[in-house]
Amino acid sequence: MKAATTKSEKRERRKKPIIFCDFDGTITQLDVTDQILNQYAHPAWREVEQEWSCGSIGSQECLERQMALVDASAEELNALIDAVPVDPGFPRFLRWLEDSGLPFYVVSDGFDYVIRRVLKRAGVNGQLRNGDALFANTLSVEGRRSVASFPNRSSECKHGCATCKPVIMRRLSREHGPVVYVGDGLSDRHAVAEADFVLAKHQLLTYCREQGVACTPFDTFDDVVDAIEGFLNSSRAGSGGAKSRGPRARRGTRVSTE
């Protein structure tokens, strides 16, 4: 039987930051889903992508329609996935996470099939690869057909997302301190509203700048480690709670990292 959480443990947990991270184009250097579509899908996938980019459809409908256009065997997909490079700073980031003891979750509009294979190659095990620290869509390969399903969609979602990142983040961050989000693409644009500290690159960086969302640019996970440490150190140096610098600051959220 699991022991009850004490008040002191709850207080400590509220002070501890929680980190959420995208996968495709963030942990990997390329968007794996886009690579699959480029290589093996009927060209009509680009028209579907445009519908999603302009907001006409959500990512669930987008991915469902796009993956139905893929013609590839499991062996072909695996070979493509195995060739996708991982961010060179990611191993250091994982070591830093282990040393710091901070909770870390991958929230992705990509596919568990892909993510688990890449993480295995990167030497990642445990909850991040096999357990409840990974939230993504499901992909089944049947002959040359790829069938997508969406276990992390939500009835609360207003945007038709395949993986509703804001709902997941709100649920998991209730008893934690500052919320950190790391991402690169348009599928992250709704997630940043739930973060106190945003690290962004590529399309997400452009979106944040256009929308006036406070963020810190990054290139690799070496930058991510340094930026998060800087954010936490500056928070600790303040008196009492530290004002959040990300989107949640505009809602008056107050956080503490002491």
Model regions: which residues?
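C-terminal cap/substrate-recognition subdomain and adjoining C-terminal extension
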Residues: 2, 89-103, 110-258
